[in-house]
Amino acid sequence: MQRVTITLDDDLLETLDSLSQRRGYNNRSEAIRDILRGALAQEATQEHGTQGFAVLSYVYEHEKRDLASRIVSTQHHHHDLSVATLHVHINHDDCLEIAVLKGDMGDVQHFADDVIAQRGVRHGHLQCLPKEE
């Protein structure tokens, strides 16, 4: 492990310390390493050809204009990416779905974009993790 020195303005340092405390990091170095890993993972996931895993979560109105069937159709069109899906009924109108995905990160991003762009889908979020060699 290498020791490096960085310079941060006061506001950014205060924000880092606040984040570190909220997340329970023992020191700034652990927080910065985690933030850097996240940024590098996100960067890696934007390239076609990179293999990895992802979690796609979203809330949708299940009775909105055949939305449920459109989402299922999209899932079947990308069946090779899907590892598992969890479906939760939030209330009478809304459902939460969480899909675990595996494959080419460009294809995963395309699938997530297709789902999240559907009218009636809210709070869509894709968390990607590149496959470690």
From Swiss-Prot:
Binds 1 nickel ion per subunit. Transcriptional repressor of the nikABCDE operon. Is active in the presence of excessive concentrations of intracellular nickel. Homotetramer. It holds the Pfam family RHH_1. Ni(2+) binds at residues 76, 87, 89, 95. GO terms for biological process: response to nickel cation. Belongs to the transcriptional regulatory CopG/NikR family. PANTHER family: NICKEL-RESPONSIVE REGULATOR. SUPFAM superfamilies: ACT-like, Ribbon-helix-helix. Its cofactor is Ni(2+). This is Nickel-responsive regulator. Keywords: DNA-binding, Metal-binding, Nickel, Repressor, Transcription, Transcription regulation.
